Every structure is written in C-alpha cells, then in structure tokens.
From Swiss-Prot:
Record key words, sorted: Acetylation, Heme, Iron, Metal-binding, Oxygen transport, Phosphoprotein, S-nitrosylation, Transport
Subunit structure: Heterotetramer of two alpha chains and two beta chains.
Protein name: Hemoglobin subunit beta
Keyword Metal-binding: yes
CDD domains cross-referenced by the UniProt entry: Hb-beta-like
Binding residues for heme b: H64, H93
Cellular compartments per GO CC: blood microparticle; haptoglobin-hemoglobin complex; hemoglobin complex
Recorded name of the encoding gene: HBB
Family assignment from sequence similarity: Belongs to the globin family.
Top-level taxon of the source organism: Eukaryota
Residues in coiled coil: none
Residues annotated with N6-acetyllysine modification: K60, K83, K145
Function: Involved in oxygen transport from the lung to the various peripheral tissues.
GO MF, any single term: organic acid binding
Length: 147
C-alpha cells in the first residue's frame, strides 16, 4: 500500500496521463540495462546488448519496457493493493526468473529519472516525491514473494 495525499495522487495520475508508455518504458528499461549492466543477465534472449546504442535501439528491450510500464500503469489504479496487484509477477520473478529484488528498486529510480527528463519543469520536486513513494511501493510489492 502506498500512502499518498490527495495532492500527490492527483500529481501522479495527472502526469501519468501524459506518459507515452511505449517510449518511456523502452527508455527506462534500456537505461537500467546500460547503467546497471549486470541486469542484462536476465535478458540473454534479447540479442545484441553489447553497447549502449545496441541496448537503447533493441526492439525486444523496447517491447519489454512497454510491458513493464503496462504493469506499472495497472499498479497506479490499485495503489491500495499493490501486493495483490503484483503477486503473480512477484512469484514469477522470484521463483522462476530468480531476479534480485534490488533490481526493482533500481528500475523504479531509473523510471523517475526518465520521467524527469521527459517532463522537465513539470516534474517538480513535489511530483518527484510522490513518484518516489509509488516506485518504492511497487518495488516492495514485487519483492514481496522473496520475504
């Protein structure tokens, strides 16, 4: 559960309504793979991830980034039940994929950076604070199965 004030919730949903999930998702996942290259080990089937350009232009990275942000969008409509919303994904990432749960926190922080880049002055410190709460809540929900 993420505790947001009415103002924070409004800021998150208003900005999210302007997000191009295809573009931002691919960029966020791509940046995760470039900035934290050890995360690439989970994406062996994605082909060429040998350079930053290869990662950022990789169609499989872009497609999976879109999928990730689609799940994140779903979470935004269930802020009061993030653990339930992400239960199946938590189980998949824990039991089958064996993803280090720290990667969820890293991706959340990268997403905040990408949103700041895309929205500039509109991404005020108050908006950032609200998004940091949300991405922390999502990361916690995704890591739930690990506990």
């Amino acid at each position: 559960m993420v505790h947001l004030t009415a103002e924070e919730k409004s800021a998150v949903t208003t900005l999210w309504g302007k997000v191009n999930v295809d573009e931002v998702g691919g960029e966020a996942l791509g940046r995760l793979l470039v900035v934290y290259p050890w995360t690439q080990r989970f994406f062996d089937s994605f082909g060429d991830l040998s350079t930053p350009d290869a990662v950022m232009n990789n169609p499989k990275v872009k497609a999976h980034g879109k999928k990730v942000l689609g799940a994140f969008s779903d979470g935004l409509t269930h802020l009061d039940n993030l653990k339930g919303t992400f239960a199946q994904l938590s189980e998949l990432h824990c039991d089958k994929l064996h993803v280090d749960p720290e990667n969820f926190r890293l991706l959340g922080n990268v997403l905040v950076c990408v949103l700041a880049h895309h929205f500039g002055k509109e991404f005020t410190p108050q908006v950032q604070a609200a998004y940091q709460k949300v991405v922390a809540g999502v990361a916690n929900a995704l890591a739930h199965k690990y506990h």
